[in-house]
């Protein structure tokens, strides 16, 4: 059951987070985009999941792409907002120092601003790991006629077989917790130098 939903979760999570990151960089580089892109991005975050899932099935079919599309929609906005906040978190004096050395936008981004934004981005990655799992499971309620964790929960709940329902719920919870723990461990290795990470050790 977990293998069935894993492909949609992983691919949707990677695509959604990557898209959110790239749009955040574009908005930061060209601030005029903020007026056009942020309202649209905010709108996508407010779309009801139960309404999106059937539409995704109609567009992409019953296989994993429809679930991945729902996951992309759920994970895009948190990554966008967190990355934008992280890019603004670098110290103003440090930015002025880079400017005084005539550092380009790209050099400042890679040397100063992205490292400062790392904890913000990892926070979004961890939250999105749970959102991705939830999104894929809910999407399976509408578009997985024969398999999947969401399908199993739906079918067994209809049969009042609460044992299997709870088993599926526990599997989902454990999977989400493991993903969160792995990302937290990766964060400690990647951003070990950041005060917010050192303070958690």
PLM regions and their residue ranges:
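Periplasmic/extracellular loop-to-transmembrane helix junction in inner-membrane transport proteins
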Residues: 1-14
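Short helix-capping/hinge motifs at transmembrane helix termini and TM-loop junctions
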Residues: 27-31, 60-62, 74, 142-147, ...
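Hydrophobic alpha-helical transmembrane segments of polytopic membrane proteins
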Residues: 149-185
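Short cytoplasmic-facing helical segments at TM-TM junctions of multi-pass membrane proteins
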Residues: 79-124, 150-153
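Generic hydrophobic transmembrane alpha-helix motif, especially the helices
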Residues: 41-78, 85-86
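Transmembrane alpha-helices
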Residues: 69-73, 105-139, 167
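Transmembrane-helix boundary motif in ABC transporter permease subunits
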Residues: 11-41
């Amino acid at each position: 059951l977990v293998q069935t939903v894993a492909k949609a979760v992983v691919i949707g999570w990677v695509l959604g987070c990557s898209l959110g990151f790239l749009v955040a960089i574009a908005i930061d580089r060209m601030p005029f985009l903020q007026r056009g892109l942020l309202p649209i991005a905010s709108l996508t975050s407010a779309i009801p999941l139960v309404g999106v899932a059937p539409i995704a099935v109609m567009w992409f079919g019953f296989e994993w792409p429809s679930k991945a599309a729902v996951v992309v929609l759920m994970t895009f906005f948190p990554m966008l907002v967190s990355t934008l906040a992280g890019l603004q978190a670098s110290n103003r004096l440090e930015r002025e120092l880079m400017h005084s050395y005539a550092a380009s936008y790209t050099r400042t981004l890679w040397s100063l601003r992205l490292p400062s934004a790392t904890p913000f981005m990892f926070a979004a990655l961890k939250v999105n790991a749970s959102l991705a799992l939830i999104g894929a499971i809910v999407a399976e309620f509408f578009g997985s006629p024969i398999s999947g964790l969401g399908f199993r929960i739906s079918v067994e709940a209809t049969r009042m077989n609460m044992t299997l329902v709870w088993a599926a719920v526990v599997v989902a919870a454990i999977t989400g917790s493991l993903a969160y723990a792995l990302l937290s461990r990766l964060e400690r290795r990647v951003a070990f130098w950041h005060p917010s990470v050192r303070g958690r050790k």
